[in-house]
């Protein structure tokens, strides 16, 4: 049995014992710039959001980036939806069985940015045929532990999801692309066709 005074150890650090927000990872400038330049060259990019986006409270920024930069947004299949079905940017699950249009998107995309997710068995560990060889795969995670699971990606970045999305927005909003607009519109058409066929 142990007994301590109510103010025990109050003269030792930490002196302030209120809850604080967790520290956030800031992206390494050179790696970030390399990824932004890859996006700048892409014509058919896509974003796959995972649990890290939710934990980082970055859902609204994810949606804003998708709509503004014309990047279709998908959700990893084993996490609750980050965006509602009514969102213009949200296409569906990155799962070729539950959402067949994602198979065509993954097959034709030239750049896949996975934010806050894992390259696990449901993501085929980042390998073909789910992620074709001719597509660049980039993983962005907010903690080193998550990033360790994504070493097979073409590029990896340790970054808080919000920080990455803000940088992507700043970089991309002045770089419009007719090809990206057409790509984004095509994914919306495929989504609508799938919804209509599911309801018929």
Predicted feature descriptions by range:
Residues 79-84, 120-121, 144-148, 164-165:
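Short gly/pro/ser/thr-enriched loop/turn and capping motifs at secondary-structure boundaries
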Residues 25-28, 34, 38-112:
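Anionic-ligand anchoring segments at beta-strand to alpha-helix junctions in alpha/beta enzyme folds, i.e.
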Residues 12-13, 59-70, 127-132, 155-156:
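Short, solvent-exposed amphipathic alpha-helical segments in soluble enzyme
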Residues 1-14, 35-38, 102-138, 167, ...:
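Structural signature of the thiamine diphosphate
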Residues 70-79, 134, 138-144:
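Short, acidic/small-residue loops that bind anionic groups at enzyme active sites
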Residues 11-12, 32-33, 37, 135-200:
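Phosphate/pyrophosphate-binding active-site segments
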Residues 17-33, 198-200:
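An N-terminal, well-structured beta->alpha segment
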Residues 1-5, 51-53, 80, 144:
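Glycine-rich beta-alpha junction loops
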């Amino acid at each position: 049995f142990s007994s301590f005074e109510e103010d025990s150890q109050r003269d030792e650090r930490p002196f302030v014992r209120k809850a604080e927000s967790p520290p956030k990872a800031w992206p390494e400038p050179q790696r970030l710039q390399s990824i932004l330049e890859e996006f700048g060259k892409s014509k058919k990019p896509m974003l796959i959001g995972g649990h890290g986006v939710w934990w980082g409270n970055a859902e609204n920024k994810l949606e804003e980036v998708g709509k503004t930069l014309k990047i279709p947004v998908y959700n990893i299949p084993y996490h609750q939806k980050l965006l509602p079905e009514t969102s213009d940017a949200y296409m569906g699950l990155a799962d070729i069985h539950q959402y067949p249009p994602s198979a065509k998107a993954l097959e034709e995309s030239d750049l896949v940015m996975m934010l806050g997710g894992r390259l696990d068995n449901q993501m085929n560990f980042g390998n073909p045929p789910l992620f074709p060889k001719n597509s660049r795969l980039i993983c962005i995670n907010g903690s080193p532990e998550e990033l360790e699971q994504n070493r097979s990606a073409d590029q990896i970045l340790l970054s808080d999801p919000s920080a990455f999305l803000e940088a992507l927005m700043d970089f991309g909003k002045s770089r419009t692309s007719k090809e990206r607009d057409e790509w984004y519109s095509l994914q919306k058409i495929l989504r609508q066709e799938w919804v209509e066929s599911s309801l018929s």
